A protein has these predicted regions:
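Amphipathic alpha-helical and helix-coil boundary elements used as assembly
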Residues: 1-168
Length: 168
């Protein structure tokens, strides 16, 4: 008897196990939730899990920031939407902007624009109960895969190692 009010905009976590060993954890907030078919002893539900950063796509703004660096402006945007799990891993100092305008764009679009102008990228670190947004100006600081994952589009058969079969 789950309702959307109980689930939407709440923290959720997807844990992936292989041979009873935790191999990955994905933490986020529920953006979409639907109830599917109900059977004799079960009900199917579907949900969309997104990073908390997606909250910034829900608000449009027009405003001016004065005498702030891009990390300071990004911090303001995140804190306004209740996002406190973030960090900056920068190799250089960002210049203070005398004047910075957000005009009729979502907070997320504004964040993306400022990050691109400053040469910043972001990634997420998923831990139990939270995900942390990390801004960086150096690609070598981004998380790396332990080993390559093969891409296999052929259906059927049994492959002993993990692989990617489709991208969307």
């Amino acid at each position: 008897n789950l309702t959307p009010e109980m689930v939407v905009d709440k923290v959720a976590e997807l844990t992936l196990y292989r041979d009873d060993i935790l191999v990955q954890r994905v933490n986020g907030i529920v953006r979409r939730f639907t109830q599917g078919d109900t059977g004799h002893h079960h009900t199917f539900y579907s949900l969309t899990l997104v990073p908390a950063l997606e909250r910034l796509s829900l608000r449009h703004n027009s405003r001016i920031f004065q005498l702030n660096t891009v990390p300071e402006i990004l911090s303001i945007l995140l804190q306004e939407m209740g996002i406190n799990d973030y960090a900056f891993a920068l190799t250089r100092d960002c210049a203070q902007r005398e004047f910075c305008v957000q005009y009729r764009e979502t907070d997320l679009d504004f964040l993306h624009r400022l990050a691109a102008e400053e040469g910043l990228v972001y990634s997420f670190i998923h831990e139990e109960g939270k995900h942390t947004l990390i801004f960086s100006d150096a690609s070598d600081s981004l998380p790396k895969l332990g080993e390559p994952i093969p891409y296999n589009t052929l259906a059927g058969g049994m492959i002993e190692s993990p692989y990617i079969s489709a991208l969307s």
